[in-house]
Structure formats: structure tokens, C-alpha cells
Amino acid sequence: MRSKAARQKSLDFDQRGSRSSPHGFRLWRLIALGAALLLGVLTYFAGLDSLQIPKNGDEFPYAHIARLTAESGHWLPLQSTLDNMRNTKPPMLFWQGILSTHWGQDWTLWQLRYPNVLYTLATALLVGLLGWKCSHRHIATGLLAATLWLAFFSTYRFGRPFLTNAGEVFWLFLPFFLLLYRGKPGVDSPWGVPLFIGLCTGIGLLYKSFALLLPVGLGLAFWYWRYRHFRPGEFLKRDVVKLILIALISLGVFALWFALDPDPQSIWNEFVIGENAGKFDPHGPSYLSKMFWGDGSIWVLATGYALNAGLLALVVFAVMGHGLWRAIRLRDLSDDEKFLWWWVLILFLVFCFPSQRSSRYLLEAMPALAVLMALVWFRLSRWVLFVTTLLCTLAIGIIGYLGWLLQHDVGQQIYSGTDAVLLVIMLAVLVLSLLIPKLLPWLTLPGVFAAYLTLTGFLGVFDGPMGRYSTRTQNQVAGQTVWVPYSFNAAYEQYRFLLPGAQIRGYRSDAGIPLHILRERYPLLIIQEPLNAADCTDCKILGERLDLKGRQSDEEIRAMVHGDVARHLFLRERLIDNRHDPR
């Protein structure tokens, strides 16, 4: 057994610079970390109503379902015009969207997304409190843990859009937070804590899937067993009934969907069989070959935590290596750290078995990873932080270069001098931190947020006058049917935010239909062209805007790598009126 002094040392993220430090230095450190956390919070609200924020393609199908369900005037059944996508997810996210948009009356991206940002910030609060508790109540560690959680790219990408992840992560991390934060009283609670955990887990399942009960249940079971020092008899006597209660309550909450929906058979066919059982179908090669080879293998999933961290990927690898060294050689991991590492490992092992493997499935353990990183942040090699800060600097420089390319191709000033000055200041501060290694622990995370804000600034032009249709254009097509291009499920839903009041219909932009055929078919039509495309001389153009091309082919990516970036990244979109076309 390790001594109490060894446990104390392992829990303290920076024992030498904490209580032994002068009061002024401790205060300065709290101010610096608090400022970094505040910068992170502001970053999450910046550009929240943008169509271009980092996300994945599921946001618009989910918005489509929420909008049609709101228009129906009923909570259930869920509504959709998409084939086999009416019950693609449980109803909690869609109910959230219905409430936040006041039954679709305030249909804006901000209204759809802000509840998820609040969920993400609530998770940051849990992470901060856990960091504070695990470090023997060091406020600095709590601030650092919350900031790290917000700095993960997976949090930024999936914790802001109208997706299931923000609510799912909050509710499914809350049980682990409660057990670790309360300690023995929470574990020994006969029914109060298990009841609360069951309710939390059930709500989390209503955001994503009943299948998540498996990793959560295994994680909780292992934690209870670990609290009993791996004594099977005591575990069976004191905790198995609690785990059964948690499972029954959580499944009971999830079963409300079946009980309240007038068409439960469709839920079974579309969600249980199609959405969940289908994840064990290898869709091509055999199950085992896909498990061990290809881009969906377990080896790719093993990099999932680092991929989720984004610019902090190297830090994740360093923390994992450091944790492994301490577990095997030093044997000085605290009990709190062991519990968190076990949850990180259990979630990875569970999601090795479905044939569809993605780093997105590991999001529930990212809060635990943020706490673990905060506990050792100031013990990391300066080279790890140096490379991470260098990556942030390069990312900001590349985004600035893309902005210059766009402005050059458009042929007019679209970014202000203030934007350029702020860009130079951010780069100068990061370069200074690279030259003065002592600054790295304090400026690496602000550097990550600076990269996110630079991306927001670059994308801002697509949400300004040049990236939106004018009010005059919107009024001209209000109440009219406008045919818009799309290449992914329900991607046409975004045009309801660009042309509010218009009746939006989609056509496949990847079908290769010539322009003259499109003009014959559709009275009001939106087309997308490269910036350098020739003007349509006989077209009646009601409006146009700048846009980003969301998906590039392999050939286009190769061309971009060789320097032909603007032609394959930027688009000009035109709204054409064919209603009086003499042809």
C-alpha cells in the first residue's frame, strides 16, 4: 500500500507551486486561469448562429425532424419526410428544439443551439468541480480542468450544434461525477443515489440510445466493485441490487418513448433494428476483418481520444504515457485517478465491438480525460506544450492565409483592418510563448481558443451581407417554392434560415444535371458555381452570396494540396428566376 504522503503528492497537480507559493503568485495564477476559462466560454457563444460552424451532417436532419414535429402540434410521433429517418434518434433532442424555438415560432440557429452550449458549460462545471475535488480542493486545478474540457475540438464541434452529444454527455457523465465527488457516502447510499443515477442515465438514453446503458452500466459496476476492493461477496451483497435498480429505472425512462408514441412498431423497426442492431453489420468485409483492418478498425479507434482533443492531441498521448508509467513503475496513481482511467478504458473496450467505430463514441469519457490532464498539466514536458502551441500558431496562420485567398478571389475587401491587427497580435503572443517556455503552460489553452476564434472570424464573412441573401431577395421569394442544391440528407434545411418564408425543396447537386435542364424544371432555382465561373448572361438573378464547399472529392483534395485551394473551397451561389423564361 502506498503511503498517505504519496497519495497526497500524486493528487496535487503542482505541489511545489501551490500552497508553498507566495500569495501574490497564487492570485495571479487564478486570474490567468480564470481569464482562459472566460475566453473559452466566450468562444462557445461567438458565431453560434453561423451556418458554417464546425459540426457534422446530422444537424440538419435533426432540425428537419424538430421543425416538422413542432408544426404537427404534437410531441409524438416524430415527423419527417426523409426515408427511414423519422425515428433515427430518441425524442429528447427534438423536444428540446421544440421548446427552445417556441414550437418553431422562433426558428433560428441560435434558438436551436444555445441549449446545447448551456449543456456543455454545465459539463464544464462538473469537470471543474471534479478537478477541484481530486486535487485536494485546489481552485486552479478546477479552473484548468474546465478549460481543458472546453478546449477539446470534440467539445467545440459536437457541443454547440443541434446534435445529441451535449445533452448525452452531460447526463451520462453526471452519475460518475456524483459517485466520485461524494465518495463513500454516495457509494453506500441504499436508494437515493441509485435512484438519481437511474433518472440521469434514462434521460441520457433518451438523447442517444438505450445501447449506451451497456458502457455506463459496466463502468458503474466496475466502480462499485473497485470501491469494495474487488471483494465479490461484499459487491454482490451491497451493490448488485443498486445496479439492477439503476438499469430498471433508466430503461423505464427510455421506455416512455414506446409508451407515449402512437406507433411503437415504427420505433422498433427504424430505431432498435435499423439504427442500433445495424451497427453490428460489417457492411462489406467480414466482422473480424473490419475490426482489425481499415479505417474502422480498433487501431483507429485507439487514436480516438487524441482525435477528439484536436490541437491537444499530443497532450493526450503524453498524459496517457505518463499515466501508464505511473501505474506500472511508480504505482502512485490516486484512487480518483484510477477510477477515471478505468472509465476511459472501459468505454474504449465496449465500443471496440460494434462494426461501426468512431471517435465520437468516446465523447462520454472526455470529461474524465480533462480532469486527468489537469492533474498533471504542470508536470508535462515543455516540448509537448511547445509543439501544441506551435500547432495552434500554424492553424491560425493557415486560416489567415485562406482569408487572404478569399479576399483576393472576390476582388474586394471583405475583412477589415481590425481583423488583420487582431490576427497579428494573436500570432505575436503565441510566438512569444514559444520563445519563453515558462509561458507555455499559461498560453497553450488560450492559443487553442484563439485558433477557434480565428476560424469564427474567417467564417464570419459567410454570415455577413456577402454570405446572406438580402432582405429584398427574401421578400421576393416569400411564399414561393425555391429549389435548392444538396448532397447530404436534409442539407436543404439550411436554406430555411437563409430564405425564411420561402417553401424550400431540394434537388441533388451531385446528379450532374446541366443548368439548362434545371432551369426548365424549376421556376425558382439556386445554383452553386466556382468564383471564377462565367456569368449566365440570359439569367434573371434575384440574388447571390458566397459559400463554402462542404465536401471535396479525392481529386479536389489533391488539387488543394498542390496549391489550388480557392477554386475548390469557395463557391458563389445564385438565385435564378425562371418564371418568365420565354423558353
Label each region the model flagged.
Residues L11, W132-H136, P175-P194, G204, ...:
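Membrane-interface transmembrane helices that cradle and orient dolichyl/undecaprenyl
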Residues W28-E59, R226, I246-P262:
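Transmembrane signal-anchor helices characteristic of membrane glycosylation enzymes that use polyprenol
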Residues A36, V127-A151, K338:
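Transmembrane-helix signature of polytopic, membrane-embedded enzymes
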Residues T43-G47, P61-M85, M92-W95, L99-H102, ...:
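Extracytosolic helix-loop segments that constitute the early lumenal/periplasmic catalytic or substrate-binding loops
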Residues Y62-L68, R157, L199-I203, Y207, ...:
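Transmembrane-lumen/periplasm boundary regions of multi-pass, lipid-linked membrane glycan transferases
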Residues L112-R113, R157-E168, S358:
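Short acidic/glycine- and proline-prone juxtamembrane loop motifs at membrane-interface regions
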Residues Y114-H136, L174:
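Transmembrane-helix motifs of polytopic, lipid-linked glycan transferases
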Residues L195, G323-G506, L531, T537-D538, ...:
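Membrane-embedded architecture of ER/inner-membrane glycosylation machinery
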